[in-house]
């Protein structure tokens, strides 16, 4: 299957980034922001070839003159016209393939509304004429990528986080918990606490700068109170960051205060449980006989689990909640930013998977609802 001519395409549509490539590859070929930008002002320069919309990196680089919109909010597609633009861009500009020649594996958020899966299926077959397609749950793919079939995945991206217990390859829907707290919220919170320090970030374009600060400088403290004291008494934790205009800003306790919101959502004014408690609650909703396997196989996945120190902190917090003799293992693969995509690449290239595709013929016979029968 690693021959590009017939290779399946794997597209992981996240709230923040699209990861796309060919099944059998070990990393996605195209990773670009899930954004569609439209000009804020009427173009005055005739013949400049100004477009009415820009997608991905191009939208990002022209962000100063555009209004940026994310068609995927909290992991779920909310704007199908823009989503179609993103898929079109993925096939024709990024991967440079004809979608009618390749089977395509798409990913979806856990607990995705049924109508959404049907709409995805319909667009693939009717707009892009795909020969075959499949929709897989993101967290399940992350678990495959870690070489397991049983475990609990904490998947946290830009728009949403989920804890998904999986047993022998099947997600347990009654125990899946969703947390509307993820990378974008942490970026917004970092914008807010940097404003308190006297730096002003307000526009959608400036938010991207703060996201970069977050990705480069933030980390999770093992002991938050202790770290706050260290930060107050010395400048050892301070780092500087150069803004695009050359101004240099200094960032101190904000480095760990922003990601701390994952463990203490009250920082964001949210009443929900932190990620450690959410994981624990999710495990407790499972059958008592499989909990041991879940504790011992807690897999982190997604870009918002990339903070240094997050695995150790998670280990510490879950150990405090779990029964005293329980063996707890947090698995944080270095490539976890792309583990959903990697899992999709593995799945779509398995010989045993080939019978699982929904073919164009099956779609024509049954319509969009076929997706519920074949993808679970």
Curated annotation (Swiss-Prot):
UniProtKB keywords: Acetylation, ATP-binding, Cytoplasm, Cytoskeleton, Hydrolase, Nucleotide-binding
Catalysis performed (reactions): ATP + H2O = ADP + phosphate + H(+)
EC top class, as a word: hydrolase
UniProt-listed PROSITE patterns: ACTINS_1, ACTINS_2, ACTINS_ACT_LIKE
Residue numbers carrying N-acetylaspartate: 3
Subcellular location: Cytoplasm; Cytoplasm, Cytoskeleton
CDD domains, per database record: ASKHA_NBD_actin (cd10224)
Keyword Signal: no
Propeptide residues per the UniProt entry: 1-2
Pfam families: Actin
Molecular function via GO: ATP binding; hydrolase activity
Primary location group: cytoplasm
InterPro entries in UniProt: Actin, Actin/actin-like_CS, Actin_CS, ATPase_NBD
Gene Ontology CC annotation, any one: cytoskeleton
Enzyme Commission (EC) number: 3.6.4.-
Family, as annotated: Belongs to the actin family.
Function statement: Actins are highly conserved proteins that are involved in various types of cell motility and are ubiquitously expressed in all eukaryotic cells.
Name of the protein in its database record: Actin, cytoskeletal 2B
Organism from which the protein derives: Strongylocentrotus purpuratus (Purple sea urchin)
